[in-house]
Amino acid sequence: MFNFLFNSSNQRKINSYAPIVKKINALEIEMQDLPDKVLRAKSVQFKSRLQNGENLDDILVEAFAVVREAGLRVLGLRVFDVQMMGAIILHQGKIAEMKTGEGKTLVATLAGYLNALSGEGVHVVTVNDYLAKRDSEWVGQIHKFLGLSVGLIQQALPKVERKLAYQCDVTYVTNSELGFDYLKDNMVLSMSEIVQNKFAFCIIDEVDSILIDEARTPLIISGPSEAPIEKYSRTKLLANILSKDVHYEVDEKARNIILTEQGTLFCEEYLSINNLYDLENPWVQYILNAIKARELFTKDVHYIIRDKEVVIVDEFTGRIMSGRRWSDGLHQAIEAKEDVVIQQENQTYASITYQNFFLLYPKLSGMTGTAKTEESELDKIYNLEVICVPTHKPLRRKEFPDLVYSNEYRKWEAIADECYDMYRVGRPTLVGTTSVEKSELLSKLLNQYKIPHSLLNAKPENVEKESDIIAQAGRQSSVTIATNMAGRGTDIILGGNPSYIAKSILVDLLIGKSSVKNNYKLQQLSPNTKISLNNILNALETDLHSVDFSMLEMEKKISIACEQVLTDDKLEIQLRKAYQMIFEEFETIFSKEREYVSQAGGLHVIGTERHESRRIDNQLRGRAGRQGDPGSSRFFLSVDDNLLRIFGGNKIADLMQALNVDNDTPMESTLLSKSLEAAQKKVEAYFYDTRKQVFEYDQVLNSQRQAIYAERRRILESSYPRDCVLQYAESTIDDIITFWLTSKENPEKFVNLNIKIKYLLNAADTFSISKDLYKDSEELKKWIIEQVRINYDLREAYLEQIKPGLIRQLEKYYLLQQIDNAWKDHLQKMGALRDSIGWRSYGQQDPLVEYKNEAFNLFIEMITHVKHTVVYAILRSRLMMKND
């Protein structure tokens, strides 16, 4: 029935969805006959049925049939059977693996709509702001047509609008914005500042990128700390005179530095100190970071210099990560290395990994083109099953064997030759590189070949054109160089993307203020079309000047004009005429190119290096052969590539030498392919172990985080925080008495209980505990607690006279302030513990067990500290004291 090969287990699951899809299809004609008003009213009926006891599975068939019809009316897109299957998988809280171009964005609307009917809100998560905005404006129209509200979270969105967006039925948001909002919500001082609602259902687009690639990187909210900047400058000079394999060793697999005993002694002598590991004056972390900056972090690969600042390049997407900084002093070490201004080191205020963040959702699902290779990890950590969905049309992509060269430069020459061959026959080519540096090297080679090409990497001048470049990467003879998966989410359509270019022209003309005459994209259009377009825009001038539209409002109007959604807005109707005019002419131009490019063999994808994960390689291959188009892919490698060098290059180099392969001849064999796959599996296993270890250690901190955040929320929601303060007071008095009883046994540490309690209560000099009470510790405790309550009542009455309700505000403020300060310090201690715990393995101890034990002790210390400081801060506050 389907044109895709699956293992029997996966196929059985797919077959089980066929009867449900058949029922949905049976309703198609009935839905087509319904007027818009009646179709919209279905949402109200579904909600009513849910309130009357039915569940989501009971209404799934009819709800999906409604969304399919709405999509056809609003966007002109009909949901295919395989897309229905993908949506059922999402609704069941699983991962749907769907190939590039199979319409994942549309699939999410079905599961999103169904689950939003429960009234609990659905979060659709994408990897960047552009995709979140595109999806909310495009497929979000289906939800709006059916009466649901659609929210969009963008990076600079103000708090009030952010809160409203989260209250919508369906909210489109990036993973980072979602995670940071969660952390910020757990740092607020009043309930009104919280923007997020209770988590219910989440659909993650490109789920593998977020749950696996970014799993090792925690989300961190930080502020300035007091770390001395001069240490970075001194250790930079020190690192430059240290010798590799003498003073330190480099573990490239773990991306770590190990100081040798000789190195430790040399550093101590150079710095004139006795102990690198002294907790009062630590130097070791600064030295290790300085060496890491030199050995493991390369300019234009891991970061770029922009405006005299070090800016991180995302190793998975090739995009720059503005505003993100490496933690634990690493960023400062790289700034010292590059001789730019060293910015103050930050202290962590709040943090969470994506692993633990997304596990907060009771129901989680995702979609991607590549997840099957990581299904074991997704199942073990997230309890997410991966199901491969068959393609709508047969896959026609040819995957040519890898070519391996004995040196790197010959590899790049061969890639340039391949680009030239494709350019000559008119086939579009997409070249995936692993860094800015490599993409620019290839660009220089192509310039020597006089091959016109587009360059897409993390450099700021290229980033802005990302979607434009990718959208037109399927045109005849086009050559596009892109770092990793830049442009992921934008389809490469053979011959070019007429709808994208038509919309981008309207944006240029109306928001970018370019003219019809000067817009380079319009050069291919006929003179008559240009004149007609100019006339429409001139007629719109009056409307545009009469109303002062914001850029956001103008973008919304353009989005509506470019889709099939019904509108009676005069401006949108005129914009639609302009869009149709541009679209139709480009469609004519592009359709001829599409036919030529298809016959020539379609898009050719070139990989320039095998990634650490087979999944990332598959993502690159997946750009070709979308929706049954022809296409091909090939990887060009050399024994100098990082993966082969670190994880098995010697075997391959020896094999090439044994076969007497010269520098110019590439090697291609089954044995070689097996060696490459073995190397990748080795890396995947290594990084899985790393992520698993991160998860296991973070689980310890996560349980503590949940306890602290729950206590914070309890205080925030409380209208009477006095109870909490008095609970803390009882606990504090208990600790004081226990300490006093212990001290009685040791004359050197004896504590005067009377002085302690007098100080706590801020009592008069005449305060005295009766000698009889000392005989019974329980009675003593009850009496002191009673004194605290009496004392508290008097001070509360005094404050109520000054301002009613002031005491409650003070209590809440002190409670939250002390919890936040203690948690901040606790995170620092936990970080230090995590960094040092690995050494325990040398003493035949399990580092994780030791970490759990010590983390528990630190947590108890922190809780005790919070209770004590809150009680002392409130009882001894000047505001709480009456001036007699």
Curated annotation (Swiss-Prot):
Alphabetical GO CC annotations of the entry are: chloroplast stroma; chloroplast thylakoid membrane; cytosol; plasma membrane
Q: Name one GO molecular function term.
A: ATP binding
Matching entries from SMART domains are given as: SecA_DEAD, SecA_PP_bind
Q: How does it sit in the membrane?
A: Peripheral membrane protein
Pfam (any one) = SecA_SW
Q: Name one GO biological process term.
A: intracellular protein transmembrane transport
Binding positions (ATP): 83, 101-105, 491
Subcellular location field:
Plastid, Chloroplast stroma; Plastid, Chloroplast thylakoid membrane
Job of this protein: Has a central role in coupling the hydrolysis of ATP to the transfer of proteins across the thylakoid membrane.
Q: Which family does it belong to?
A: Belongs to the SecA family.
Q: What is this protein called?
A: Protein translocase subunit SecA
Organism per entry: Pyropia yezoensis (Susabi-nori)
What lineage, starting at the top, does this entry show? Eukaryota, Rhodophyta, Bangiophyceae, Bangiales, Bangiaceae
Gene from which this protein is expressed: secA
